[in-house]
Amino acid sequence: MLVLTRKKNESIIINDNIEITVVDIQGEQVRIGINAPKSISIYRKEIYLEIQAENKKAAEIKNVDLKEDLKDFLK
C-alpha cells in the first residue's frame, strides 16, 4: 500500500484522470473529494463489501433455482 501525506486542500492524481483532494480535517475524520470520470464507480469500502455480498448471495440463489428447474425439466 502506498501511503501519502496530504494537508487540507492538497490533492493526489491517479492515472491522469482521477483527482483525490483533502477537503477538510476535523479530529480523526478526514473529508475527501473525488473527481473522476462518470464511468468509474466509487464506493465507500463498507458499501462495496455489502454490494459484493448481496451479489454473491443472489448468484447462489439463482444457481439453486436453476438446478431445481433442470431437475423438473429432466423428469
Curated annotation (Swiss-Prot):
Keywords: Bacterial flagellum biogenesis, Cytoplasm, Repressor, RNA-binding, Translation regulation. Its main location: cytoplasm. Pfam families: CsrA. The keyword RNA-binding applies. GO terms for molecular function: mRNA 5'-UTR binding. GO terms for biological process: bacterial-type flagellum organization; mRNA catabolic process; negative regulation of translational initiation; regulation of bacterial-type flagellum assembly; regulation of carbohydrate metabolic process. It is found in: Cytoplasm. GO terms for cellular component: cytosol. NCBIfam families: csrA (TIGR00202), PRK01712.1 (NF002469). Belongs to the CsrA/RsmA family. A translational regulator that binds mRNA to regulate translation initiation and/or mRNA stability. Usually binds in the 5'-UTR at or near the Shine-Dalgarno sequence preventing ribosome-binding, thus repressing translation. Its main target seems to be the major flagellin gene, while its function is anatagonized by FliW. Homodimer; the beta-strands of each monomer intercalate to form a hydrophobic core, while the alpha-helices form wings that extend away from the core. This is Translational regulator CsrA. It comes from Acetivibrio thermocellus (strain ATCC 27405 / DSM 1237 / JCM 9322 / NBRC 103400 / NCIMB 10682 / NRRL B-4536 / VPI 7372). The gene is csrA.
